[in-house]
Amino acid sequence: MSIMRVSALAALSAVSSLSVAETPAAAQDKYAQRKAFVSQFAGETKSSMPFFRSYDFEPLGDDALLLWQSPGRAYLLDIEDFCPDLPSAQAIAINNKGSTVNARFDTITVLTRGQSAIDRCRILEIRPVDVKAMKAAEKAGRELDKNANTGG
């Protein structure tokens, strides 16, 4: 079993994207928007992906996960039904054999503060993400927001 631990800073940033006063419906909407954005840059479904270690992860609600293998390589994972603790995950464990993660066979285990890891959530779909294009679109969006806010 390969385990990816998230640094305190990375875990904080994943959780801090949701404000304390945010309603569950607003949080789900935010995850849905982010998942839709990431999906635009996700390629064709793959039956498996190489896996040696992870760099980071980003929950996209309780049914999807953006798994970063490096700053320039990521995969969009769709998860079976739903994985209720995924949005508040401090870390995840990828339960696989060898150096490959297989859709429909392998699972993730969500690790949260104060809870033992009991839920295994099956990986249904694996899609590679065009990280370069996604980051360019994010940068362009920030520039548009900046120009709109400054009147430029």
Region roles according to the model:
Residues 83-152:
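Helix-rich interaction surfaces within compact, conserved domain-sized segments
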Residues 15-17, 50, 122:
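Generic detector of short, well-ordered, non-transmembrane alpha-helical segments enriched
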Residues 7-17:
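Bacterial N-terminal signal peptides
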Residues 1-5:
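Positively charged n-region of N-terminal signal peptides that target proteins for export
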Residues 23-87, 143-152:
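N-terminal secretory signal peptides
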Residues 20:
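Ligand/cofactor-recognition surfaces for anionic moieties
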